[in-house]
Regions:
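Glycine-rich phosphate-binding loop of ATP-dependent small-molecule kinases
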Residues: 2-243
């Protein structure tokens, strides 16, 4: 059986978005949902490369690739890197031998327009989205997870004043240095990030739900429980595709 089927031009998008046995996964969820933790485990489970678009951009710029040079021109001007440049980078990654069995994409798409452009580009390469993994976490829990985070100034040990507090307020248990809150972790900043996330992601969730590839997971469960649920779901998808 071939590793994946070619997508037919003109096929209905709802029926053609996930027809391949390779695993092309998109990771969605609010800040603080634990996406990084789950990504690390899933890439080991299914031997998939993890593509975080921010890291991908920085790596391309550092290596001086043609697309990296293009991206740098926009970044140096303080402009957003256009979607077509980012999508071409993603497609380049897909062409590498490491991505022969699929990939795990985090940080893109962020809105429906980007999702449509990515789908069209992948379709042109005979590929599609197998599943979009959404880790759901309520806003107030996100605020607690992020605004409660404290780092020690000396060695960067991490605490959370709500779920994993130090023995003494604002003092690291391990080296006695002062604990501080990063500016990005302040509650007002977190709430602004959540507002942007919901504005962008609500239509994106509906987009993938309409295509039958959205899989929801309860981010209030322990990281191990979330991982077990995601792994079982993806394993079932792979098994169904091979039948």
């Amino acid at each position: 059986m071939p590793r994946f089927q070619r997508l037919e031009h003109g096929a209905d998008s709802k029926s053609s978005i996930a027809v391949m046995s390779e695993l092309n996964l998109i990771l969605l969820g609010p800040p603080g949902a634990g996406k990084g933790t789950q990504a690390a485990r899933l890439t080991e489970d299914f031997h998939l490369p993890y593509i975080a678009t921010g890291d991908m951009l920085r790596g391309a710029v550092k290596e001086g690739t043609p697309l990296g040079k293009q991206a740098k021109e926009y970044m140096d001007r303080g402009d957003l890197v256009p979607d077509d440049v980012i999508i071409r980078m993603i497609l380049d990654c897909m062409e590498s031998p490491d991505c022969a069995d699929g990939l795990l994409l985090d940080g893109y798409p962020r809105n429906v327009e980007q999702a449509e452009a990515l789908e069209k580009a992948m379709k042109g390469k005979g590929r599609g989205v197998t599943a979009t993994i959404l880790i759901d976490v309520p806003d107030e829990e996100v605020v607690k997870r992020i605004s409660g985070r404290r780092l020690c100034q000396k060695n960067g040990h991490v605490y959370n004043v709500f779920s994993d507090p130090p023995k003494h307020d604002d003092v690291c248990d391990q080296d006695g240095s002062r604990l501080v809150q990063r500016e990005d972790d302040a509650e007002d900043v977190v709430r602004k990030r959540l507002s942007v996330y919901h504005e962008q992601t609500a239509p994106l969730i509906e987009y993938y739900e309409d295509r039958g590839v959205l899989k929801r997971f309860d981010g209030l469960r322990s990281p191990t429980e979330v991982h077990d649920h995601i792994r079982a779901t993806i394993a079932t998808l792979r098994l169904e595709d091979e039948l």
